Curated annotation (Swiss-Prot):
Keywords recorded for this protein, A-Z: Pyrimidine biosynthesis, Transferase
Organism in which the protein naturally occurs: Vibrio vulnificus (strain CMCP6)
Enzyme class: transferase
GO-annotated molecular function: amino acid binding; aspartate carbamoyltransferase activity
GO biological process, one term: 'de novo' UMP biosynthetic process
Function according to Swiss-Prot or TrEMBL: Catalyzes the condensation of carbamoyl phosphate and aspartate to form carbamoyl aspartate and inorganic phosphate, the committed step in the de novo pyrimidine nucleotide biosynthesis pathway.
Domain of life: Bacteria
InterPro entries: Asp/Orn_carbamoyltranf_P-bd, Asp/Orn_carbamoylTrfase, Asp/Orn_carbamoylTrfase_sf, Asp_carbamoyltransf, Asp_carbamoyltransf_Asp/Orn-bd
Enzyme Commission code(s) on record: 2.1.3.2
GO cellular component terms attached to this protein's record: cytosol
Name of the protein described by the UniProt record: Aspartate carbamoyltransferase catalytic subunit
Bridged cysteine pairs (disulfide): none
Length: 309
C-alpha cells in the first residue's frame, strides 16, 4: 500500500494528519533502533540553505547520508546565482528539480517553501524553516522525543515557557499536539510575548484545554513536558528585558516538586533560560532531543522517497 507521504511536499504542520505524524514518529523509532543504510540508495537530495543553519542543516545532511542518499547543495545562499545574478527562486527551483529527487530548503522569506513547491515539477519540497513562519521538521523531532520519553502522544500536560509570540517552534508543536487526545496546555509568558490569538482561537474551536500563566513555578508539578524557549533580548529595552528574563529561568531547584516522568525540552540554542545545574537532573532531555533530529529527518526522507515503506 502506498504511504500517504510519498512525494508529498512537507510545508507546514497543519497539512499533516494525525496518522501521518504517527507514521513518522513510528518510523523514526524503528530507524533509531535498527539503522537502514540503503533506504534511499541512489536518491539525490538538494540541501538548499539560503540562510545560516547549524543544527538543522547538519542534522538533515547526516540523515540523508545515513540512509544511503547523496546530498548536493549550498549553505550560503548569498553565493548562489540567485543572489549574485538576480535569478528568481522559482527559476532556481525549476532548474535544480532536474537534478534531484527531493529538496530540503531553508529561506528567510515566509512562504518561500510553498513557492518552491509550486515550481519544483513534482519533486517534493521539505521546509527546513521559512522565516518566522513554519519549521515542521523541528516539530517532528519534538513529537518523536515526547513519544520516546512518555510512551504516548495522548493524555499529556504540556507547558510552553518564554517567547510564545514569535517562537515558530511552539506554534507548530501546539498545532501538532492538538491533533491528539486529552492534551492540556499551559502557556507561560509575559503579556508582551503571549501565545498569538489565532492559536488560542483554534484550540477554543477544537475544545482543547489550555490556561495562561505568567509564572512557571506553580505549574511545574502538573507537567509531563516542560518546553522552554529563549526570551529574545532585542525585543525589549534593557530594564524590561532584565525583569522578564529573570522570571523565566529554569533551575534545578524549581524541578524538585516535578513528576518523575517530566522531561525538559528546548529547541536550542539556549542562552541562560536553563541553568547548567538542570543538565545534571533526570528531567533534562534537550541534548537528546537535538540528537533525535537525525532520526526524525531520516524517517521523513525515507517516507517521502519510498512509495511502500
Amino acid at each position: 500500500m502506498t504511504n500517504s507521504l510519498y512525494k508529498k511536499h512537507i510545508i507546514s504542520i497543519p497539512e499533516l494528519s494525525r496518522a501521518e505524524l504517527e507514521l513518522i514518529v513510528k518510523t523514526a523509532g524503528q530507524l533509531k533502533a535498527e539503522p537502514n543504510p540503503e533506504l534511499i540508495k541512489n536518491k539525490v537530495v538538494a540541501s538548499c540553505f539560503f540562510e545560516p543553519s547549524t543544527r538543522t542543516r547538519l542534522s538533515f545532511e547526516t540523515a540523508i547520508q545515513r540512509i544511503g542518499g547523496d546530498v548536493i547543495g549550498f549553505d550560503d545562499g548569498g553565493n548562489t546565482s540567485l543572489a549574485k545574478k538576480g535569478e528568481t527562486l522559482s527559476d532556481s527551483v525549476q532548474v535544480i528539480s532536474n537534478y534531484v529527487d527531493a529538496f530540503v530548503m531553508r529561506h528567510p522569506q515566509e512562504g518561500a517553501a510553498r513557492l518552491a513547491s509550486e515550481f519544483s515539477n513534482g519533486v517534493p519540497v521539505i521546509n527546513a524553516g521559512d522565516g518566522a513562519n513554519q519549521h515542521p521538521t523541528q516539530t517532528l523531532l519534538d513529537l518523536f522525543t515526547i513519544s520516546e520519553t512518555q510512551g504516548r502522544l495522548d493524555n499529556l500536560n504540556v507547558a510552553f515557557v518564554g517567547d510564545l509570540k514569535y517562537g515558530r517552534t511552539v506554534h507548530s508543536l501546539t498545532q501538532a499536539l492538538a491533533k491528539f487526545n486529552n492534551i492540556r496546555f499551559f502557556f507561560v509568558a509575559p503579556d508582551a510575548l503571549a501565545m498569538p490569538d489565532y492559536i488560542l482561537e483554534d484550540l477554543d474551536e477544537a475544545g482543547i484545554s489550555y490556561s495562561l500563566h505568567t509564572d512557571m513555578e506553580t505549574v511545574i508539578p502538573e507537567l509531563d513536558i516542560l518546553y522552554m524557549t529563549r526570551v529574545q533580548k532585542e525585543r525589549f529595552d534593557e530594564s524590561e528585558y532584565a525583569h522578564i528574563k529573570s522570571a523565566y529561568i529554569l533551575t534545578a531547584a524549581l524541578l524538585e516538586g516535578a513528576r518523575e516522568n517530566l522531561k525538559v525540552l528546548h529547541p536550542l540554542p539556549r542562552v541562560d533560560e536553563i541553568t547548567t545545574d538542570v543538565d545534571k537532573t533526570p528531567h533534562a532531555y534537550y541534548f537528546q532531543q537535538a540528537g533525535n533530529g537525525v532520526y526524525a529527518r531520516e524517517a521523513l526522507l525515507a517516507l517521502v522517497l519510498n512509495e511502500s515503506l
